[in-house]
Amino acid sequence: MSEDDSKKEPEPEETEAEIKHEEISREEDDEGGEFSTVTISDIEMLLKDTEIWDKLLRNELSIEEAKKMFDDVARSYSKADKKKRRVEKKPKKGKVTKKSDEEEE
C-alpha cells in the first residue's frame, strides 16, 4: 500500500503543473486574439510612425516637423478606415433590402 500511496502523491503535483500549463495556454490564446485584429494598414502605419521617430531621434527632423508627419500619417489611415467602413456597410444594407423585398412578396 505504501507504494500506491507514493504513486498517488505525485499526481496532485502533476495536476497543479497541468493546471498552470493550461492557464498559460489560455493566456497565450487570449493574447493571440488581440493580434489577429491588427490589419496590414495598421502595421504600415506603425512602420511609418517608427521611421518618423527614428529620424527624430537622429535629429533629422524637428519636433514640429515630426508632429506634422504624425498627423499626416494618422489622417491618411483614418481616411482609409472610413472607406473600409463604407464598403462594409453597403453589403449589409443590400441584405436588409433583400429581406424587405422577400417580405413584400
Curated annotation (Swiss-Prot):
A Pfam short name: RNA_pol_Rpo13
Give the E.C. number(s). Answer: 2.7.7.6
Q: Name one GO cellular component term.
A: cytoplasm
The biased composition feature labelled Basic residues covers: 81-97
Query: Region (Disordered) spans which residues?
Result: 1-35, 70-105
Spans through the membrane: none
InterPro entries in the record: RNA_pol_Rpo13
Composition bias of kind Basic and acidic residues appears in 1-10, 70-80
Q: Which UniProt keywords apply?
A: Cytoplasm, DNA-binding, DNA-directed RNA polymerase, Nucleotidyltransferase, Transcription, Transferase
Q: Which family does it belong to?
A: Belongs to the archaeal Rpo13 RNA polymerase subunit family.
- Subunit note: Part of the 13-subunit RNA polymerase.
* General function of this protein: DNA-dependent RNA polymerase catalyzes the transcription of DNA into RNA using the four ribonucleoside triphosphates as substrates. In vitro binds dsDNA but not ssDNA.
Name used for this protein in its record: DNA-directed RNA polymerase subunit Rpo13
Organism equals Sulfolobus acidocaldarius (strain ATCC 33909 / DSM 639 / JCM 8929 / NBRC 15157 / NCIMB 11770)
Q: What is the lineage of its organism?
A: Archaea, Thermoproteota, Thermoprotei, Sulfolobales, Sulfolobaceae
